Amino acid sequence: MTTTTSSTRTRTGLDLTDVTLTFGDGDDQVAALDHVDLTVAPGELIAIVGPSGAGKSSLLAVAGGLTRPTSGSVVVDDTDLIGLSPRALATFRRDHLGFVFQSGNLVPALTALDQLRLVEKITGRRAATPPEELLRAVGMDQHAGRRPGRLSGGERQRVGIARALVASPSVLLVDEPTAALDRRRSHEIVEVLAHQTHEFSVATVMVTHDHDVLEHCDRVLEMVDGRLRPA
């Protein structure tokens, strides 16, 4: 397979319009998302806070094309995910969307650098920014040869952020990146996330319960009972 370089694309960010996600039928129907509107511009870091069960995880799943909404539109780079076939959606998600999970979700047998190289191998494209430079950008270049078992929780999250940027995503969806981290490391992780969001012009949505780190975000929204409002 021929390896190519990630192509330049026009970034328009993320736009959710009148998105509803319901479960159940009739009187038992529950709205996880209730007519949600959300626009995130390239280079903008949005934090979403709110109680457990408010719909934050459902919002990330819909925005990432992992769950199909009951109604509404989910547009990334002028493409409505709702209109794509499953195969086209999988390809689009790979090329335009990045995910960072609270566990880091790294491959135990691979070094930090090889975590990033694996993405290049899977996609068949060289990263627009070399993996070595991405690790340097998140302060992990000195630990490039270490496997996850020899990294702290904060270090694993840094690698997870770098890995998510390998495919040059237009939209980055981040779920509780500071969970189980102490206060200092929590601030460090969100500072890194904010810097990379601005540096690479990524539209980033971060779900968090950690109010201490909100100062690093461009906007903060609160989700209550499936609805978004300014925090």
Task: Give the positions of each predicted feature.
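Catalytic Walker B motif of ABC-type/P-loop ATPase nucleotide-binding domains
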Residues: L172-D175
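Conserved signature/switch motifs of ABC ATPase nucleotide-binding domains
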Residues: R94, R146, A167, F200
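ABC ATPase NBD coupling module
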Residues: V30, L81-G98
